[in-house]
Amino acid sequence: MQVRTIREQVRAMQRHWPDFVVAEQLRDKVVWFGSLAGLERMYRVMIEYGLPREAAPPTLWRRFPVIRVLSPRLEPNFDAVEEAPLPHVYFTDSDITLSPLCLFDVEAGEWSHNDLIALTTVPWAADWLACYEGWRAIGRWYGGGRHAAIPEEKAS
């Protein structure tokens, strides 16, 4: 499997999402901050991504790009008809409002390290935000997908 370099990912983000700012860039890791529009409001998000490393302890952001909504915070709805308390997220943080978004099924091949984050993950996150706003309004998730299990040791 070919793996895109961090430099390739950064260049693609600059080209397609110029308002996203690189907050940290190392040889094998990058973090961006930027804004995405839902249907009714803007959201400030963070994207964390790292190249896979066999010798390193497994972390979620080395398996795939991790997107968290920073503001406004995700609002849990424990009474939602479906997907309570939050739809399609990975519950890896003690603060569930900062849970990484579940945007694709890695095991089903929906994303790989050869994909450009700017052309896959970011547009999918914008779509997720629109579906999230619908879920907030009616308590049903219309974003599709299935929950991919993340082994506990890979969630850190």
Locations of regions flagged by a protein language model:
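Order/disorder boundary and secretion-linked terminal/linker segments
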Residues: 1-24
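Compact alpha/beta protein-protein interaction domains typified by the UBC
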Residues: 18-106, 116
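Domain-level detector for trafficking modules
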Residues: 83-156
